[in-house]
Amino acid sequence: MRSVEILGLAALGSLVAAAPSPSRVSNSAKKASSCTFTSAAQASKSASGCSEITLDNIAVPAGETLDLSHVDDGTTIIFEGTTSFGYKEWKGPLIQFAGTGITVKQNTGAVIDGDGSRWWDGKGTNGGKTKPKFMYAHKLRDSTITGLSIKNTPVQAISVQATNLQLTDITIDNSDGDENGGHNTDAFDIGESNGVYIRGAVVKNQDDCIAINSGENIEFSGGSCSGGHGLSIGSVGGRDNNIVKNVTITDSTISDSDNGVRIKTIYDATGSVGDVTYSNIKLSNIAKYGIVIEQDYENGSPTGTPTTGVPITGLTIDGITGSVASNAVQVYILCGDGSCSDWTWKGVDLTGGKKSSKCENVPSGASC
């Protein structure tokens, strides 16, 4: 009987010894090796478990997304060579990221080429072909996207919905669209975000260099923007989130664009724009407005009738200098009655163009 007990205990001991340690399995999973993928399907399905992912000359099939929204937290994603996309009329996105502690970058000489001319028809998102949005940086937290070279997006380039996201030294070159029907090629569209920092961007496009529709604690600095619609807040209003606050846009240049500095809010909507600073912005060859602030947008166009539901308060305009084209307006302000207040306005020095005779409800201290 005694020998049976001993044998039983020995057998039990061997089973316990053979059982894997949960902590060791967990740690080994976290330390998975680098992975290189040559197809979008591989990358989208097999990225989990890789601490570093290299995307080597990926050709994304038509109508599919290079989906990197399920990578492990802390993953580094590296673009290598040319990333390209098949043609199909659909809404996209062509690429998407999500996660915590994610780093996205590229190796020297890499390019992410949307080949947007296949979709461009001069209508953008307002009709014609259905065009895919390019990149979703959604549900990213404590992450970095750096050094990407992006070319010829079909429409909007990078859509941001994130918390504490750094976007540094990104080039978005849609200049081919100037003569080939590029439209609505916004570079950075930001919504429902807290802590977005865009530094050193170089943008050539046919729409906003940056458009902040909602969010707080947002910074754009050291940027160079040309060909588009300028540095924009809005349109604000008519969405689930209609609050913009604590935004700094500074130390940047805007050239050969429709507008320089722009804030626009939606007619008869509600929301707020507060504590926004534009400082040290250099303008050159601005075609329509050097500075334009209006509370009258409806269906994508100004109505000429401002409303008061989205007040603009705590605005600082400081050091906006340079030139506008001969037919352009230096400054245009169209506010509702009492809905623009507590503004600081200094160092505005624009040449060329003309002054507006249609400004309304200009707040104390501002000049139109």
UniProtKB/Swiss-Prot annotation:
GO CC terms of this entry: extracellular region
Disulfide bonds: C35-C50, C209-C225, C335-C340, C359-C368
Single GO biological process annotation from the record: cell wall organization
Class in the EC hierarchy, top level: hydrolase
Residue positions the entry lists as glycosylated: N246
Propiece residue ranges: 19-31
Catalysed reactions listed for this entry: (1,4-alpha-D-galacturonosyl)n+m + H2O = (1,4-alpha-D-galacturonosyl)n + (1,4-alpha-D-galacturonosyl)m
Main function: Involved in maceration and soft-rotting of plant tissue. Hydrolyzes the 1,4-alpha glycosidic bonds of de-esterified pectate in the smooth region of the plant cell wall.
Designated name of the protein: Probable endopolygalacturonase I
Species: Aspergillus clavatus (strain ATCC 1007 / CBS 513.65 / DSM 816 / NCTC 3887 / NRRL 1 / QM 1276 / 107)
Encoding gene, per UniProt annotation: pgaI
